[in-house]
């Protein structure tokens, strides 16, 4: 779906939206894997003091709860009185509702596609960022794109078709298909530390935030478990222990969102992976 927010932050000081400290603000929801990918990019680049952050409630709420005819759902904040109002394009006022993540400057909404925002944070702030970490290095761009369109998309699609299945029977069928993809990923990770090259990239951040959500919702009674795939377990520990990543994970918000969507479902039994335990992934570098 095309976005009405398709502007870009650029390095040039003469750009319409130049990279500047304190000019941009990020709105994220911890229960959303796409928003957490962007939050991870902000942290890995060391932009915490340059790009502001507001965290929404883990579940969309009715934006006009007193109007029974308006069923629109959108962002809410734990303390909305402290959240700055936002003026969008053409001086139009926008309540804090919509698709997340969003990057906003003091005048306009900029972008709401997670991959675009990740790459803007990675490139536009390169000269200002304390960290020289690159999520999308030019020399690996083609391989990262192939990974995103390949194994990352397969795992993401498998997770959502299982998690959002309409019946238990369909969920089990989709789960079996998902683990076929997981086995392929585990075999890949037996040979290499990361999905692309010898460094963590945006492909790994995307994969991580999908896999941990599956770990959260999987059941002890499942015939197959994520913990049976030791290369994936080590991979998840490796990424989780990378500075800036652990703070993008909020298990409580994930559970709150799941319970809201499936109020009759039992409480989640995961996560099962011990994310803070040692790993030996560096040996593959």
Predicted regions located by residue number:
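C-terminal alpha-helical interaction module
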Residues: 1-285
């Amino acid at each position: 779906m095309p976005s009405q927010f398709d502007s870009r932050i650029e390095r040039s000081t003469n750009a319409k939206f130049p990279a500047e400290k304190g000019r941009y603000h990020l709105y994220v929801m911890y229960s959303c894997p796409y928003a957490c990918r962007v939050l991870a990019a902000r942290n890995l680049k060391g932009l915490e003091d340059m790009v502001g952050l507001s965290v929404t409630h883990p579940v969309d709420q009715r934006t006009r709860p007193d109007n029974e005819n308006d069923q629109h759902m959108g962002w809410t904040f734990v303390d909305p009185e402290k959240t700055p109002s936002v003026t969008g394009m053409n001086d139009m006022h926008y309540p804090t509702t919509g698709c997340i993540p969003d990057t906003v400057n003091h005048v306009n909404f900029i972008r709401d596609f997670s991959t675009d925002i990740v790459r803007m944070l990675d490139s536009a702030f390169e000269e200002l960022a304390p960290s020289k970490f690159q999520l999308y290095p030019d020399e690996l761009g083609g391989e990262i794109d192939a990974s995103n369109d390949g194994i990352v998309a397969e795992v993401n699609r498998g997770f959502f078709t299982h998690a959002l299945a309409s019946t238990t029977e369909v969920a089990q069928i989709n789960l079996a298909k998902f683990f076929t993809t997981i086995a392929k990923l585990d075999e890949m990770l037996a040979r290499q530390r990361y999905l692309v090259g010898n460094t963590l990239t945006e492909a790994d951040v995307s994969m991580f935030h999908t896999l941990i959500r599956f770990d959260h919702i999987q059941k002890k009674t499942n015939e197959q478990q994520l913990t049976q795939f030791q290369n994936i377990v080590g991979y998840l520990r490796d990424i989780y222990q990378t500075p800036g990543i652990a703070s993008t994970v909020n298990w409580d918000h994930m559970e709150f969102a799941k319970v809201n969507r499936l109020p009759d479902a039992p409480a989640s039994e995961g996560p099962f992976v011990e994310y803070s335990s040692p790993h030996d992934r560096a040996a593959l570098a």
